[in-house]
């Protein structure tokens, strides 16, 4: 038994994996296990995982058939031994005191969820500092902050969760933007959320993972997720309902931007998105 299980899905990240794992193993908080989930990676990522496991007893490795990010996270959740769960994407890296900060806040505030801030990292660009807050909030207050999206994001990776939050919840397999599908259900399981938005997580936007020349129909699942969330949040009060609706509008804007960038405006869904925005936002 350990305090924290850190789950790292691994797939085709050979150039980035060592930096990621090294940043986790260098944490100032030391009572943790790292679960590296090799999701059928065709490169040497799986071998690198095994190498770390042979050198550090805190590292465990799962080798599985490729099933996608949600499937890999779920596999890690299923075997986690920690009282708390954290997630790190295998092409990202973290500050050495990230889990110390998250753990101290979740324990001190007797919270169900602890959140820190994220640096968005782009090749050749300096990470930008974002507004910071430090407060403990109710689930409703936390939901509003996440719906507004200017300080707290929906990402799974900059958070520390009580393990019980996932007792009957898993990430939706086969879905794009999986974090958006589960965030409302996660917050509904919380009573208190500790927020310290100091930026401790480096979210790397890989050029080879974002193809600006093509558009995938999976992008429409971002809209689907927030429409589902909007429906879940009906009857929660005017502020929540308005924020949820704004989030659906934002999802439509984001997908439309990707369609235009990819010069795929002939898609039949484009007219639907434009019609929605004209009737709900413009």
Residue ranges and their predicted role:
Residues 64-80:
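Glycine-rich, basic loop-to-helix element that forms the pyrophosphate-binding segment
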Residues 69, 90-194, 204, 208-217:
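Donor-binding/catalytic cores of nucleotide-activated saccharide
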Residues 31-40, 60-65, 90:
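Short beta-strand/loop segment that forms part of the nucleotide-sugar
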Residues 5-8, 35-36, 63, 188:
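Short hydrophobic beta-strand elements that form part
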Residues 23, 38-48:
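A conserved acidic beta->alpha catalytic loop
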Residues 205-282:
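C-terminal subregions of glycosyltransferases and related glycan-biosynthesis enzymes
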Residues 85:
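Short aromatic/hydrophobic "clamp" motif used to bind/position activated sugar donors
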Residues 1-25:
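N-proximal low-complexity "stem/linker" segments adjacent to membrane-targeting elements
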């Amino acid at each position: 038994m350990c305090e924290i299980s850190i789950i790292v899905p691994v797939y085709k990240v050979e150039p980035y994996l060592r930096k990621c794992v090294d940043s986790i193993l260098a944490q100032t908080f030391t009572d943790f296990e790292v679960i590296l989930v090799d999701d059928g990676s065709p490169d040497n990522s799986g071998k690198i995982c095994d190498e770390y496991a042979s050198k550090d007893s805190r590292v465990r490795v799962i080798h599985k058939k490729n099933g996608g990010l949600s499937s890999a996270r779920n596999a890690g959740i299923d075997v986690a031994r920690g009282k708390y769960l954290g997630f790190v994407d295998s092409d990202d890296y973290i500050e050495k005191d990230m889990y110390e900060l998250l753990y101290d806040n979740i324990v001190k505030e007797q919270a169900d969820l602890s959140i820190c801030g994220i640096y968005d990292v782009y090749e050749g660009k300096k990470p930008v500092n974002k507004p910071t807050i430090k407060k403990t909030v109710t689930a409703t207050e936390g939901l509003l902050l996440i719906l507004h999206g200017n300080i707290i994001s929906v990402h799974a990776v900059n958070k520390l969760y009580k393990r019980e939050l996932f007792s009957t919840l898993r990430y939706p397999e086969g879905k794009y933007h999986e974090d958006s599908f589960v965030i409302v259900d996660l917050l509904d399981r919380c009573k208190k959320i500790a927020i310290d938005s100091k930026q401790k997580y480096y979210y790397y936007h890989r050029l080879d993972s974002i193809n600006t020349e093509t558009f995938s129909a999976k992008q429409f699942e971002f809209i689907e997720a927030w429409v589902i969330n909007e429906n879940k949040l009906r009857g929660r009060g005017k502020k929540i309902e308005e924020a949820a609706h704004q989030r659906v509008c934002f999802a439509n804007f984001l997908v439309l931007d990707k369609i235009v960038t990819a010069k795929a405006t002939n898609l039949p869904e484009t007219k639907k998105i434009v019609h929605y925005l004209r009737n709900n936002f413009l």
